[in-house]
Amino acid sequence: ELMTEVGINLGLSYDEAFKLVKHTIDGAGSLIVNSSLGPQKLRENVTSPGGTTHEALAVMMNKDNGLQKIFSAAIKAAAQRSKELSKV
């Protein structure tokens, strides 16, 4: 949803943005499902130095405000809520 929204904000139509998002997610999912390599090696294999994936990953993997911090907080919140719900 957010990726589609960003694509639209960059000038793509909804259909173009959503199609790119679907293919990106499908491609990434297929890579990890159909490979014996781990996620780090797969990432390294598709990342060209100075390329578009490299630039996107530099933002997403920033230790101060990147996805690691966001995913950690989200997973911890879900785990906490799961514990709360298991007591009901």
Model-derived features: positions:
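Anionic-ligand binding region
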Residues: 1-18
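NAD(P)-dependent Rossmann-like dehydrogenase/reductase catalytic/cofactor-binding core
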Residues: 18-88
